[in-house]
Swiss-Prot record:
Role of this protein: Converts heme B (protoheme IX) to heme O by substitution of the vinyl group on carbon 2 of heme B porphyrin ring with a hydroxyethyl farnesyl side group.
Catalytic activities: heme b + (2E,6E)-farnesyl diphosphate + H2O = Fe(II)-heme o + diphosphate
PROSITE patterns: UBIA
Subcellular location: Cell inner membrane
UniProt GO cellular component terms: plasma membrane
Name of the gene this protein is made from: ctaB
Predominant subcellular localization, coarse grouping: membrane
Pathway given in the UniProt record: Porphyrin-containing compound metabolism; heme O biosynthesis; heme O from protoheme: step 1/1
Membrane topology of the entry: Multi-pass membrane protein
Note, other: Carbon 2 of the heme B porphyrin ring is defined according to the Fischer nomenclature.
Protein name (Swiss-Prot/TrEMBL): Protoheme IX farnesyltransferase
UniProt cross-references to InterPro entries, sorted A to Z: Protohaem_IX_farnesylTrfase, UbiA_prenyltransferase, UbiA_prenylTrfase_CS, UbiA_sf
Amino acid sequence: MVTATHSHPVGRVRHLARQYAALTKPRVTQLAVFCAIIGMFLATPGMVPWRVLIGGGAGIWLLAGAAFAINCLVEQKIDALMRRTAWRPSATGEITTTQTLIFSAVLGGAGMWLLHVFANDLTMWLTFATFLGYAVVYTILLKPATPQNIVIGGLSGAMPPALGWAAVANDVPAEAWFLVLIIFTWTPPHFWALALYRRADYAKSGLPMLPITHGEKYTLLNILLYTLVMIAATLLPFVYGMSGYIYLASALVLGAWFLKYSWTMYRNYSDQLAQRAFRFSILYLSLLFAALLIDHYFKFVPQI
């Protein structure tokens, strides 16, 4: 049934635009693009050229959205079974398979063009490889096959800082890979916290998520261990000399905060605590990368 709001042409267009936007998972895309932009700024001692910042950032945004649209398409039947995702237009059938494919192709093509014109071909192909890694390797091959899907497939989700760095420098040095490693090690504890408090949903989906295949306590142990590995990874920018004491202090404080969540969950789990830990993990990554940016321009390293 068409509601009064959607019966008006303008209302229908707005509603349809929101539905298409939902396919791109805007909140996840925003975090990815934020990390990519931080990578851009870290790649240069000065200001990022505006054409790269805007054109390159938009290109990465569009290709990320294209990958998420394919993810929604592939998982539409699974999403329909889960309370968290049943509202997605791909799951409800409001946007068809053909429409989703065309939408993804348009976003992907536009993103490739923007990166070619405003950044460089290295960034274009790296971003396209990231698109394939998420949309094909992770979504189609790994996610339904192994409870370690988020670990093995996490590289594609960790690539944005390297993409941003490449857009400015036309190179991906060790410093960029340190940023990738941070997100790579952050992803498992971030996602498994969600999988724990949504495990009833995932049990209905049939996906082999770690809390379903190995149980709550094993998952909590893995969250704790990966948190420790993540904290170690966050120290690499300081050890390597790319960041100073402002970043180090931020990384240690934020890491201790993250570890407190992981340890408390391990000792006394509750779904409410896991939900808070999941939400904090997003704030954690945002603040950590913001600290990298601040430190980059106001680096404090005491003279020895």
